[in-house]
Amino acid sequence: MVLIPFFENASQIVPNCQTYPKHQTALAFFIFYHKWTEYFGDSNYAVRGMLEKVMVRWDTEKKVSKKGYSLNGESFENRNIIGRVESDTLTWVWQGYDHKISQSALFHELVHLALRAKYGTADPDHEGTKYRGWTRLHSSMIIECKQMLQSFNL
């Protein structure tokens, strides 16, 4: 377990020394929070509080989910996934294409955790209508976060 600098009790579990130096993950967290507050605000610091105690468990392998929802809210069974929220403070994330955080599902999973911290539900059906919380703005924010991180070649 590696502590993430600037985020009091945040940590990551990495499968090897190449997956991801703590300063890269910290930069991703800063970018996420900057964009979150720009898009949605955080007047009660619920999202900042979540980032202070989150644990990211990085993995080199994708997983198969027995059930879940696509980004547009359609249910699926037995599909490869690249990230999953496992509790209020724990998320599992596949290391990403080309071994880059910007090519992983980290920002996507942080949105789920932020929604859970802010509204009490992680909104598993994303832009679907079964659960509320996730909107197209959240999806747009993720794209902007990834683009910002890509500018650092991460």
Residue ranges and their predicted role:
Residues 99-104, 116-154:
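Post-HEXXH active-site segment of zinc metalloproteases
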Residues 1-99:
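A metal-dependent hydrolase signature that marks the N-terminal structural subdomain at the beginning
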Residues 107, 111-115:
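Short active-site segment of divalent metal-dependent hydrolases/proteases
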